[in-house]
């Protein structure tokens, strides 16, 4: 599956996206654990629950079961005026 990063998350990962094997993770929660291992700086943002996850362009809950063809996007909080 493809994981896409946006805004300052790209600065943490130093890339726009990753390709992750579907055998693990199987849910968004498991994906977060996997990403924490790859990018330890993300952990504090996951703990603060400030990042939003979209699967195939729809926001989802953390217990959603993922499929190999899914595209996951991770968004930081949005502000504006």
Question: PLM ranges: what are they?
Answer:
Residues 1-79:
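Ubiquitin-like/PB1-type beta-grasp interaction modules and other compact soluble beta-rich domains
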């Amino acid at each position: 599956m493809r994981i896409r990063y946006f805004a300052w998350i790209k600065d943490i990962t130093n890339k726009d996206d990753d390709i992750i094997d579907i055998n693990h993770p199987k849910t968004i929660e498991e994906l977060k654990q996997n990403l924490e291992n790859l990018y330890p700086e993300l952990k504090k943002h996951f703990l603060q629950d400030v990042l939003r996850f979209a699967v195939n362009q729809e926001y989802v809950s953390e217990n959603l079961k993922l499929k190999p063809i899914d595209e996951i996007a991770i968004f930081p909080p949005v502000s504006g005026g």
